[in-house]
Amino acid sequence: MTHGGMSGPRVRLAEVVASLSLATDLAGGLPLEHGLRRSLLAVWLGEDLGLSADELSDVYYVALLGTVGCSVEGTLLAKVSRDELAVLGDSAGVDPSNTRDVIAWVLRNFGADEPPLRRIRIVASAIRSGQTEFQIVCRDVALQVGEMLDIGPTIRQALAQCHERWDGAGGPKQLKGEEIRLPARVFNVAHQADLFNRLGGVDAVVAVLRRGRGKVYEPRLADRFCRLAPQLLSRLESEPAWDAVLSAEPGSPRWLAPDELDAVGRAIANFADIRSPYTVGHSSGVAVVAEAAARRLGLSDDDAATVHSAGLIHDLGRSGVPAAVWSKTDPLTPSEWERVKEHPSLTELVLARSGALGHLGTLAGLHHERLDGSGYRGVSSPFLPVAAQILAAADAYHTKTEPRPHRAALTTDAAADDLRGEARLGKFDSEVVEAVLAGAGQPGLPRRKVRPAGLSEREVEVLGLAIRGLSNRQMAEVLFVSPKTVDHHIQHIYDKIGVSTRVGATLFALQHGLVQDRP
């Protein structure tokens, strides 16, 4: 059986990437549509520079996805702040060429709720090495997402360079001048231009670009944008950003074939799940179970494919909730609980603009609803189609079998009993529940005989433990080896798969089907 992929009307790559760009805005604490506006400014600047259609296409996609790697940055910031989205949002007004501004931002946000001595240590560590760690994680994630989206080597390489600076003081590789790909250099100008335009209009944009000229930004690009700023920023307000960004796609639109759509759906699933070690592989697992249940209930091939697609993207809105909330072991406060309950609506929000994906967002937005109206949004039986009931039951079952910060994973038998109990209480339809449980019990795909990147079976085992968030010492206890041996394994794995962080390794494992099913 093959999965139907991202079902529905024909889908342009640009439309999918633009939707993902909206999700990266949420994950980065940035204003919604910042990525779209940034892409427009980048393309218009590129047109004025006389770039070719191929070069403009690279600029277009890099500007849309330039912060995709930073979607996981919040998991690092969550260690020093209770709301990393607010911290990231506050950084939008920081001039990257002004060291005082950067240090003031760190002092304002890092460890604000911690005791004085611990806060001093956090701030000192952030100033000393935190930026490099963030840059490495952003690079690894950007490279993996770029590969999963199959958008070409130039775009992938440029996405990995969006934190580099013209003067070589960026990271993670301290590239300098024209060592940095042109799309990344254009991205840096357009990125700050939109942010500072929101804060202070044309004057603020020109000021920040002039201060950073020759430091953060290529002088030629900064000078050209400063001359064009009144015209470009006025044009930015002339039509809705979504319509404008689709119209601005350089060259002929790229339409995605069914197998490409399925790959893109998995990329979105991985983007949603990567923010927490507790949810790695969750969305793909829900999609498989939900599709199997839909077929058992007699839904058409198209409808079953739609359920599968909605399963892949159902948790995209999690990116708009602080990582610290998802990793909390104590009971949530009322305000934290309200933010958690918003995430299905955020999924619907970021997909609503797309004519091709909007129907999936509507369905995915119902994945926490219950027949008795006790779900997150209070939608009850008459307004819940069978597809939504299937998705909700599949999500509930799969979540029960996964560990969470506040509890251990249930066994499959215990999870099945729980789900049947909820059906008896009127939360789920019993027939839907039985279909979901039957779908979950189907044999999985055979294990790979040849591992990707030349990984050994032992290395695959170590990788599986690492992406679940275990420390080297914890992995050593599980594997009955020394922590030093585990560290050797980790370094060999990183060398083989071409990453340098666990986040990058996690995305590699997801892409290559190495995430093992939980018991």
Model-derived features: positions:
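Intrinsically disordered, low-complexity basic tails/linkers immediately adjacent to helix-turn-helix/homeobox/MYB/SANT
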Residues: 508-519
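Conserved catalytic core of two-component sensor histidine kinases
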Residues: 280, 463, 487
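Recognition helix of helix-turn-helix DNA-binding domains
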Residues: 470-504, 508
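Short, locally clustered residues in the helix-turn-helix/winged-helix DNA-binding domain
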Residues: 273, 464-468, 510
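Histidine- and acidic-residue-rich, metal-dependent catalytic cores
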Residues: 3-454, 460
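Transmembrane alpha-helical segments of multi-pass transport proteins
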Residues: 463-464, 474
